[in-house]
């Protein structure tokens, strides 16, 4: 019978071992190592070891669950807000065949969140729901992607516990070795750029830092003093280290309201693809929320990039 204890540093090797055992062979699997767990979880703002419960039996660590209240903050803790009426479960890791352990870990997290005042709980939320300081880069994508649709046993337990799908996502991937395709997109970008440039716009690339990702590059289109379109991109370091392939991530596209409908979303994406290729990227992927039809159509139709993996967030109202 497993006992649950708050995370302690001596748990770390066993926690990593069970993670790698459970996720091996899954979508975009990258073996977890201590330095990545520290960078992506334990050293992140808001990490609370009391909210990472580790399951141990006589043989050692057999699973864990990590949970907490919804938080929203971007570049500094001074901006942080906490909403205890909504909880989130960032990770539940246990052998899929051990249904009783999975249920026990889930029950423990739900009970703790409910006792803290949660009236709704998200399971594997992505950035659509709230700020995600944890597991970016180590959970199957450059960003925290959600729960893989391949985890059938866990999805079955969640359904039995009243969790229902709240959001669906995809990670489309663009292979930059397809130079003919990239060249065709660059020709389309040049046509859009000529129209925008005639209106006095300029473009720039700069570096940006945040609490959640390694330094990234931002591609911007600027009109006067206003940034009218932008997107950020950077190398997915854990994936490159594990697979020897330089897969980059793109983290969202923003177009100013008064400039929408002019092709700037497509333009800024193509400029980011080109900039990543110039840096030596082999491929680029990004995280798309299916409820955002504008973005879904941009990535899957205008750019012709097809989903490679599918993910979802679930929710339960208490």
PLM regions with names:
Residues 41-58, 63, 74, 209-220, ...:
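A short helix-loop-beta-strand connector motif used in the catalytic cores of GNAT acetyltransferases and
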Residues 113-130, 135-136, 140-145, 276-287:
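Conserved GNAT acetyl-CoA-binding A-motif
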Residues 150-164, 170-189, 289-292, 309-318:
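C-terminal "cap" of GNAT-fold acetyltransferases
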Residues 81-82, 88-100, 125-129, 252-260:
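A short, internal acetyl-CoA/4′-phosphopantetheine-binding micro-motif in the GNAT/acyltransferase core
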């Amino acid at each position: 019978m497993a006992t649950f204890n708050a995370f302690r540093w001596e748990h770390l090797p066993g926690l990593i071992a069970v993670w790698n055992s459970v996720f091996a062979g899954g979508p975009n699997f990258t073996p977890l190592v201590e330095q990545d767990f520290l960078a992506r979880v334990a050293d992140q703002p808001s990490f609370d070891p009391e909210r990472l419960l580790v399951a141990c039996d006589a043989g050692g660590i057999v699973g864990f669950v990590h949970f907490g209240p919804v938080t929203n903050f971007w570049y500094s803790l001074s901006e942080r807000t906490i909403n205890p009426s909504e909880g989130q479960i960032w990770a539940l890791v246990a052998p899929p065949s051990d249904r009783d352990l999975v249920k026990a870990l889930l029950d423990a997290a739900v009970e703790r969140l409910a006792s803290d005042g949660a009236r709704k709980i998200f399971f594997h939320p992505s950035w659509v729901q709230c700020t995600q300081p944890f597991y970016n880069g180590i959970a199957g994508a450059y960003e925290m992607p959600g729960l893989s649709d391949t985890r059938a046993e866990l999805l079955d337990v969640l359904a039995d516990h009243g969790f229902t799908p709240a959001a669906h996502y995809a990670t489309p991937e663009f292979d930059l070795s397809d130079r003919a395709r990239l060249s065709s997109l660059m020709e389309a970008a040049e046509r859009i750029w000529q129209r925008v440039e005639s209106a006095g716009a300029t473009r720039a690339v700069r570096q940006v830092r945040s609490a959640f990702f390694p330094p990234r590059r931002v591609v911007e289109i600027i009109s006067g003093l206003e940034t009218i379109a932008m997107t950020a991109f950077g190398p997915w370091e854990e994936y490159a280290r594990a697979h020897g392939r330089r897969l980059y991530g793109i983290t969202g596209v923003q177009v100013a309201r008064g400039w929408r409908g002019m092709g700037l979303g497509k333009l800024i994406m193509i400029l980011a693809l080109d900039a990543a290729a110039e840096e030596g990227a082999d491929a680029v992927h990004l995280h798309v929320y299916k409820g955002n039809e504008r973005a879904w159509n941009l990535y899957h139709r205008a750019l012709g990039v097809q989903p490679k993996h599918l993910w979802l967030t679930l929710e339960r109202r208490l």
